[in-house]
Amino acid sequence: MNPLAQPIIYSTIFTGTLITALSSHWFFTWVGLEMNMLAFIPILTKKMSPRSTEAATKYFLTQATASMILLMAILSNSMLSGQWTMTNTTNQYPSLMIMMAMAMKLGMAPFHFWVPEVTQGTPLMSGLLLLTWQKLAPISIMYQISSSLNVNLLLTLSILSIMAGSWGGLNQTQLRKILAYSSITHMGWMMAVLPYNPNMTILNLTIYIILTTTAFLLLNLNSSTTTLLLSRTWNKLTWLTPLIPSTLLSLGGLPPLTGFLPKWVIIEEFTKNNSLIIPTIMAIITLLNLYFYLRLIYSTSITLLPMSNNVKMKWQFEHTKPTPFLPTLITLTTLLLPISPFMLMIL
């Protein structure tokens, strides 16, 4: 990619997300989504290869289809209500179409087929943007229309997403696919609590971004994309050996790490609304998510593959570029739970 084009592309993505998040008019919301999508495609194809081209094509076709459904829903809603503002989305069928379009953009089940493949076909840092920044615009739309959403449909999509993300991550050796399936699971938790308490969705999104960013930065330091490469971390970057397992356990939601906080407050919110069966199902299915993280940690940190003495001394010659925000992110990933009462008080 031309270095001169990078500032333009990244500023377009930032502007598109900002327009969508701050706009209350459906047309400008749609324009922001389109800016975001078209500017992100060059990032996916930064390293030209058949795999990246395939990933960009899948991303474009999925997002374009979702945008078409969204535009159809916007036009239908404007014809029925005579309004273009997002707060007037009270008609049933346009609201259902908007939910399906946003579920497709977020990669929720049963529209999740593109997320693992696109993430696997991109570099680590492009995958980080795909699984974090690209979620902001659709979630901001869902947040603004949360009062008019169909609760039963949203809960169905959420449980399906948790099931797809938890079962899909089993038997995976590619780390990017594992993080993609984890993202699908987290989207299910976020959308499940949205009709009851939208602020909890924002809290969940914030913690999810912190955890995912930390995981991708740690993997990028070691250039680890598979389980085998991750198992060689100890002899390249010794100080990463305890940090990667703790980050993965936090992503899996193991207490007392930070990743347990969203699940804790979401289950509490469901309990306040006299709903016990749904959070129980969600929590039980999510145990599969924690299981494949535990298995990944066991195979990479506890077991030791046979290797020569020359490989064992490799850590003496490894030099990595400093990552300024990584210590702060690691601290937030593991130790944010004790200050959770203060965070909940703000919300």
Swiss-Prot record:
Q: Which reaction does it catalyse?
A: a ubiquinone + NADH + 5 H(+)(in) = a ubiquinol + NAD(+) + 4 H(+)(out)
Keywords, in A-Z order: Electron transport, Membrane, Mitochondrion, Mitochondrion inner membrane, NAD, Respiratory chain, Translocase, Transmembrane, Transmembrane helix, Transport, Ubiquinone
Gene this chain is encoded by: MT-ND2
Classification from the root reads: Eukaryota, Metazoa, Chordata, Craniata, Vertebrata
Question: What biological function has been recorded for the protein in this entry?
Answer: Core subunit of the mitochondrial membrane respiratory chain NADH dehydrogenase (Complex I) which catalyzes electron transfer from NADH through the respiratory chain, using ubiquinone as an electron acceptor. Essential for the catalytic activity and assembly of complex I.
Protein name (Swiss-Prot/TrEMBL): NADH-ubiquinone oxidoreductase chain 2
Question: What does the annotation say about its assembly with partners?
Answer: Core subunit of respiratory chain NADH dehydrogenase (Complex I) which is composed of 45 different subunits. Interacts with TMEM242.
Q: Which InterPro entries match?
A: Complex_I_Subunit_2 (IPR050175), NADH_DH_su2_C (IPR010933), NADH_UbQ_OxRdtase_chain2 (IPR003917), ND/Mrp_TM (IPR001750)
Q: Which Gene Ontology CC terms are recorded?
A: mitochondrial inner membrane; respiratory chain complex I
What protein family is recorded?
Belongs to the complex I subunit 2 family.
Give GO terms for biological process: mitochondrial electron transport, NADH to ubiquinone; mitochondrial respiratory chain complex I assembly
